[in-house]
Amino acid sequence: MNEFEDRRWIRKDGHQYVATPPGEAIVSVMEDAIDRVETERELRDVWHRLPDVVGELPTETWSELTVTVADPELPYRPVNRFESLLERTTTLRFVRPEVALMDPCLNRLHERVDSGVDVTLIDRPNCHLYFLTTYPERSAELLRRTNFTVLQHDDLPPYGTGLLDDRVVISCYEQDSGMAQAMIDTDVPAVRDWARSVYERYRSDARPIEPRQLVD
């Protein structure tokens, strides 16, 4: 405490110490540093699955990333985070949402489509086939909606990229099981610009699904 007082980071105020303006600045810097270390720790095991845009972000923006990682006791943490974001958006455009992410959220997705949320999903044919065969009636009902568009693409990146009203989500999948391993969401403008370009690139090459051809 004496050293902090000598540096004029704190001052005595009655029977307690309070931070001075320089001390408050030091606290802010330390909190930012701790946030960055915590973000790095959470991302450590999935860095290699993330797009370059995340690694290229200035470290000062790391505190603006919300990182949700699955663990053995809470394997659906990324799914739950995505579902909470889905509840608050009026649009969803997603490249490679994957079965592991969308299947647990199907009820919520259906509710949001019924509420008028505009949804476009671009995924691999096998993923669409899963929903068409597992939930044939529900899939047929969704496909009849004018605010629900499903497209297929054969060559997608290994991660998912989603655009919501005010957030961008990046989902990482476990290579062997396909489970949602982690999710990053943020409102950093550079990430949103990147996500928009990813969506537009794959959207331009995507094809409408043909349910009968997929099932056959």
Task: Name each model-derived stretch.
Residues 162-216:
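Amphipathic alpha-helical interface segments
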Residues 108-111, 137-139, 200-201:
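Short, solvent-exposed amphipathic alpha-helical segments in soluble enzyme
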Residues 1-37:
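Basic, Lys/Arg-rich alpha-helical nucleic-acid-recognition elements, primarily the DNA-binding modules
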Residues 125-162, 166:
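HKD-type phospholipase D/PLD-like phosphodiesterase module
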Residues 44-121:
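PLD-like (HKD) phosphodiesterase/transphosphatidyltransferase domain
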Residues 30-50:
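Alpha-helical linker/hinge and terminal dimerization helices associated
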Residues 20, 102, 124:
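Residue-level signal for threonine
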Residues 94-98, 122-125, 153-154, 164, ...:
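Short His-Asn-centered micro-motif
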